[in-house]
Structures are given as C-alpha cells and as structure tokens.
Amino acid sequence: MLYSKAREIYETKIKEAVFQFATTMRWTNDWEYSKNHKKPLVTRKAHMLVLIDREQIKAREALQNHKKAAFEWFMDNTAPETKKAVSAWFSGKNCERSFF
C-alpha cells in the first residue's frame, strides 16, 4: 500500500513538472519574443528541461523515502523468524526455506 502511494506521488510530481514546463514555456516564449527576437529557443528549452530534471530528482527521492518507510514498517511489524530471513537475504547469506 505504501509502495502504491509512493508511486502515485512520483507520477504526480512528474505530471506537475510537465505542466510547469508547458505553462512556463508558453509564458517564456511570449515574453522573450516581445523582449528579444534573437534569443535562441534552445536555451529556453534547456532551462525548462533542467527544471523538469530537478522535479524528477525530487520525485525519485520521495519514492525512495516511501520505499524505505514501507520496509522499516514491515520489519517492525513482522515475526522474528521473518526478520531473520529477510536480513539474511539482504546480506547475501543463505537462509533456510522454513522461514518462509
């Protein structure tokens, strides 16, 4: 459940970044056109892509934080045998099948 919530947050952040890109790009184009006809469009697009990248990084960090919180919740609310098996699996050790 926490993972699906994290995924939803990630997708929302991406949609917000794309929307911001579209609206800012339109405003920037109108403003730049009236101010200076010679400024290359590529520079403005690159600036907007940097903004989108920043939003994607923030969204990825939020997703990772939610995954970590979900795992910590699982480890706090599970049986000791399962904790032992999960810890062994993450550390790369062989774990007994009876734990699962």
UniProtKB/Swiss-Prot annotation:
It comes from the Viruses. InterPro entries: DUF7203. This is Uncharacterized 12.0 kDa protein in nrdC-mobD intergenic region.
